[in-house]
Structures are given as structure tokens and as C-alpha cells.
Amino acid sequence: MAAQQTKGLPMTARWDPEKLQREIDELQSLESRPFLSRAGGYLKRTGPGLLQSAMTLGAGSAAASVVAGASFGYTLLWVQPIAMFLGVCMFAALGNVVLTTGERPYPAFGRELHKSVAFLWALGTIVASVIWHFPQYGLAAGAARDLAELGGIPTADPAGGFTAAGYLVSFGIGAGILGLNIFTTWNYGSHARGIKLYEWFLRSIIGLVILSFAVVVIKTGVNWSELSRGFFGFQLPGTSGAATVVLGAIGAAVGINMTFLYPYSLLAKGWGAHHKALARWDLAMSMFLPFVLVTSLVIIAMANTVYDPTAQRTLHDIKPVDAAQALVPVMGSSLGRII
């Protein structure tokens, strides 16, 4: 039944039944191992949660973390973990249903609720994917222009706007990213090696971001009492704009397009009822942990380098590219901006 319902998904035709059964046997044996051994075994098999983590670590979360750290210091450290915890709970429930039934969620929504609900869900996914892509391209263009300035190419027009080189760099990086995304999307799932390379590429990029800001945090020091209050104090500053920053961070943590992608990525990996424990570990280690680490380190780094406790205002005009300033004291102006 499950195999019939997942027929036609890009990776389904490439399942190796014997390999899948070996994986199930290995997962069952992992359940009786010590915690660290079990965690290592699950970590090697993660995947769908990693896609969600990479998908949500975009311009929205970056901007919210930069503004939170630069405007309020450690105070709003609690927001991102709470936001992602809510998302993980939703994905865990969604994954449990999908792995139990092995059924595609779109027809299930149409049957159990109404076809119009399923259609609106799919439509919302498409609209959200388009809308949320605009800030990603804006962030990439801003970073590309910053690197061009570093290389001596003027991109900002003193009279306002950008120079011809600035527009060329902006549209060039946009076209490059679009081409890479199209190539990756059409080829993802074409063979097992490509999938593993793609997932390890995501791990490497996320790991680089974590390492970069971890170095800044270590070098600039941590106020442990403020850190504790930031994570567990659940304070909301009375400053104008604080509530907007909190709501923006929560809204950027998980999108409706992720709720559509996640169940299909589970089915396309060949996961079923025997993979429920792996799916929970995947959400915890590949989605929750990287997201919280990255956003928390960005907030702490901005709090240590940019935050001015005497300002008492929300820095709405600060941009994610400005997070590079947090790396300057440790890595220098040039390397900090490149990283």
C-alpha cells in the first residue's frame, strides 16, 4: 500500500529493498545501544530535517537574529528556541502520521478535510516559496556587492541607487543562484551519491556559519549570567519595536512551504513506520539544534560587538550583511566580510 502511494516520487524508483531492510534492521539494533552510540548512529542517517534546517536558515531568521542581538543584547535569546520548538512539534506530529500511513499528504488532506483545503495548502506553499525567495536574493545581492566593494569595484552610486557594476553584480549573483537551484532541484534524487553530496554540502555550510560565530563568541567572551537570563528569563523589552522583532523571529522560523516539503521528503527517502525514532532524532539534531546554534551565536556575537545598552532603541535599519561586522574584531575586516 505505502509503496503504491509513494510511486512516482523522484527517489522512490531508486530504492534498494535489500538496503532498505538492512537499514531497518540497523535502526532496530540502535534502540538497545547506549545514548552516545545511538545518537551517532542516527546522526549518520539524518536527512529530511537537515533540508528543513537549511531551508529556514535564510534572510528572515538572519535579520531577526541580527536585529535582536544588536538592539537588545542577550535579552531575546529565548525567542528562536521557542519558535523552532513549536515548529519541531508540528513536524513531529506530521511525520508520525505520514510514516504510519505511508500516504502522500496532499490526497490525504483532500479526503479527510476537503479538496479546497488541500488546494489552498498547496497554493499557500507556492506563494510562500516565491515571497520568501525575494529576501534570499536580496541578501545574496547585498553580500555580493559588499564583496565587490572589498575587491575595489564601486557598486553604490553617490547620487543614490547602484552603479552599473552594482546592478551587474546583483543580477549576476541572482542568476547564478537561480541556475544552481534549478540544476540541484532537477537532479536531486537522481542517484544516491548526489543526494549524499548535497546533504553533506548543507552540513558543511551550516557548520561553517556555526564555527565562524562560535569563534567570535569565544574571542569576545560570554556574560554567563546574562546568557542564562536571555534563554530562561523570557523577557520582552519595553522598547518600541521589541514585540515586532519577536513576532518576526517566530514567523520566520517555519514556513508553510516547509510543511509541504517535509512529509514528501520522508516518503521519497523510503522511510516508513520503522523510521519513526530516526525521524524524531532527525528533527532534534538536524533541524532544531543547528537552527538554535546558528541563531543564538549570531545574537550573542551581535550583542558582544554591536549592542549598545545605552541606546534603548530598536535598530530597524540594520541588515544581515551587517553581521559581518561582528566577525571583524576576530578575523579582520577583509576575512570577516568574506566569511
Protein language model features and the residues they cover:
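Membrane-interface "cap" regions at the ends of multi-pass membrane proteins
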Residues: A2-A63, G207, V245, W271-A277, ...
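Transmembrane helix-boundary motif of multi-pass solute transporters/channels
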Residues: R45-L86, M90-A93, G102-E103, G138, ...
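Juxtamembrane transmembrane-helix boundary signature
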Residues: Q52, V79-G110, W121-P135, T184
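Transmembrane alpha-helical segments of multi-pass small-molecule transport proteins
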Residues: A122, E149-G189, S204-S212
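Hydrophobic alpha-helical segments and their helix-loop junctions in multi-pass secondary transporters
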Residues: N181-T185, I205-Q235, A243-G248, A252-P263, ...
